[in-house]
From Swiss-Prot:
SMART domains: PDZ. The lineage of its organism: Eukaryota, Metazoa, Chordata, Craniata, Vertebrata. Expressed in small intestine, colon, kidney, eye and weakly in pancreas. Expressed also in vestibule of the inner ear. The modification Phosphoserine is found at residue 219. It holds the Pfam family PDZ. It comes from the Eukaryota. This is Harmonin. Residues 401-427 are annotated as: Disordered. The gene is USH1C.
């Protein structure tokens, strides 16, 4: 690096950055760039320290440190500040308004900046950009105006004259108490929620403008020739580039227009003055507009080839347009078919839901009727529950010949009979359940709470003949078996008895069901297809023998 360039760079860094830590960070970033040669990472890192408008000149100061092969890419990634003010006129009475939003003002300690543009609106159409600083409105400087004063100034005339310069940064400060910070426009989310780019609309001149730095120290020259444009297209243009020269290495091409060199505007310079400026320094910062005068240096053959190429491109675009229209038509047809299909599915689903609702209402109604009848006939159902035990109590085996010590003998004979009853009861208590069932695969430890949870598979033959009671909203707090009727499928299975808790029906957990919901679910599961019904029950714990004794 040229010592003079390095000295000027350090002087500018010391002038613009006061914080020593930020200075060290800047130098570290530059050292890492020269190791990795990743321009995009460099610019992203630089934006963390070049984070306010006053520091933007550092991007130009760093430009001489960038190799020639990266000059154009570096220029495209860094914010492009305006060289001069731009003036536009907007109609305040336009039906869609001015088409822009602004933020900032004296009370925020900064100027007024455009923060949002309505796409296709007035401001967008005249070339204003997000990140433009408004300098004058209707001829008045607004540097000492508050936000409200600026708004009032805009309302004074029907036609609003606005002068702006592009900065590429947006002030961020929600209230006067918060510190002022800045965001680059390519990182700023506007009020509409979209991220706006720091460059202007596609196709404008600034998109083709680029800035390069060339040091002539130790070289024979730029390696290019310049020419003045004709009357209808004035300006200074590159007419020849020597292969392998500095100009070729930095990316200059025939037809590029030179618009500025070292801060000197080339718009109105003649050929001799332009040559003198280019030869006046060994370090040149050149701003050009790519291919602005390319047609001035084309041969007839090149013009013919370009016209032919343009026609081919036009035909290709027409073909793409036709294909797009056909694809769009097909897409619309597919979308319409999909819409109709979804409509039919929704209609069928609604019909199915209505049918299911009516079925459920009918089931609940039948269950309520059945429950009422069952409650009226409760006593007889209790007799059906334990018929064998009752028989043992009502019809004991006749006693043998009475004896004086019949206090012992009468008890022995019925005891034999009761033993038989006990054997039968023991057969009823034998539970048939599915081996290998893991209750923790269906229920939480809190739901199980040490219960003996079993999976029963009952064959659907005849009626289930199983009655329930309780429910989540009852004092019991759960759904339990209140009766198992004789000759029903539940009784034939032998794995469920009165007092067992019903925890799941055909894989559906019912621990939080009301009685009506549980009965409806049980009825539906029984009436559905299939030969079996799966019930998960928590076995009723056995009662203590003392609970069954009555003392007189």
């Amino acid at each position: 690096m040229d010592r003079k360039v390095a000295r000027e760079f350090r002087h500018k860094v010391d002038f613009l950055i006061e914080n020593d830590a930020e200075k060290d960070y800047l130098y570290d970033v530059l050292r890492m760039y020269h190791q990795t040669m990743d321009v995009a990472v460099l610019v992203g890192d630089l934006k963390l320290v070049i984070n306010e408008p006053s520091r933007l000149p550092l991007f130009d100061a760093i430009r001489p440190l960038i190799p020639l092969k990266h000059q154009v890419e570096y220029d495209q990634l860094t914010p492009r500040r305006s060289r001069k003010l731009k003036e536009v006129r907007l109609d305040r009475l336009h039906p869609e308004g001015l088409g822009l939003s602004v933020r900032g003002g004296l009370e925020f300690g900064c100027g007024l900046f455009i923060s949002h543009l309505i796409k296709g609106g007035q401001a967008d159409s005249v070339g204003l950009q997000v990140g433009d600083e408004i300098v004058r409105i209707n001829g008045y400087s607004i540097s000492s105006c508050t936000h409200e004063e600026v708004i009032n100034l805009i309302r004074t005339k029907k036609t609003v004259s606005i002068k702006v310069r592009h900065i590429g940064l947006i002030p961020v400060k929600s209230s006067p108490d918060e510190p002022l910070t800045w965001q680059y426009v390519d990182q700023f989310v506007s009020e509409s929620g979209g991220v706006r780019g720091s460059l202007g609309s596609p196709g404008n001149r600034e998109n083709k403008e680029k800035k390069v730095f060339i040091s002539l120290v130790g070289s024979r020259g730029l390696g290019c020739s310049i020419s003045s444009g004709p009357i209808q297209k004035p300006g200074i243009f590159i007419s020849h580039v020597k292969p392998g020269s500095l100009s070729a290495e930095v990316g200059l091409e025939i037809g590029d227009q030179i618009v500025e060199v070292n801060g000197v505007d080339f718009s109105n310079l003649d050929h001799k003055e332009a040559v003198n400026v280019l030869k006046s320094s060994r370090s040149l910062t050149i701003s050009i507009v790519a291919a602005a005068g390319r047609e001035l240096f084309m041969t007839d053959r090149e013009r013919l080839a370009e016209a032919r190429q343009r026609e081919l491109q036009r035909q290709e675009l027409l073909m793409q347009k036709r294909l797009a229209m056909e694809s769009n038509k097909i897409l619309q047809e597919q979308q319409e078919m999909e819409r109709q299909r979804r409509k039919e599915i929704a209609q069928k689903a609604a019909e199915e839901n209505e049918r299911y609702r009516k079925e459920m209402e009918q089931i609940v109604e039948e269950e309520e009727k059945f429950k009422k009848q069952w409650e009226e006939d409760w006593g007889s159902k209790e007799q059906l529950l334990l018929p064998k035990t009752i028989t043992a109590e009502v019809h004991p085996v006749p006693l043998r010949k009475p004896k004086y010590d019949q206090g012992v003998e009468p008890e022995l004979e019925p005891a034999d009979d009761l033993d038989g009853g006990t054997e039968e009861q023991g057969e009823q208590d034998f539970r048939k359940y599915e081996e290998g069932f893991d209750p923790y695969s269906m229920f939480t430890p809190e739901q199980i709470m040490g219960k003996d949870v079993r999976l029963l598979r009952i064959k659907k033959e005849g009626s289930l003949d199983l009655a329930l009671e309780g429910g989540v909203d009852s004092p019991i707090g759960k759904v339990v078996v209140s009766a198992v009727y004789e000759r029903g499928a539940a009784e034939r299975h032998g794995g469920i008895v009165k007092g067992d808790e019903i925890m799941a029906i055909n894989g559906k957990i019912v621990t939080d069901y009301t009685l009506a919901e549980a009965e409806a679910a049980l009825q539906k599961a029984w009436n559905q297809g299939g030969d079996w019904i799966d019930l998960v029950v928590a076995v009723c714990p056995p009662k203590e023998y003392d609970d069954e004794l009555t003392f007189f």
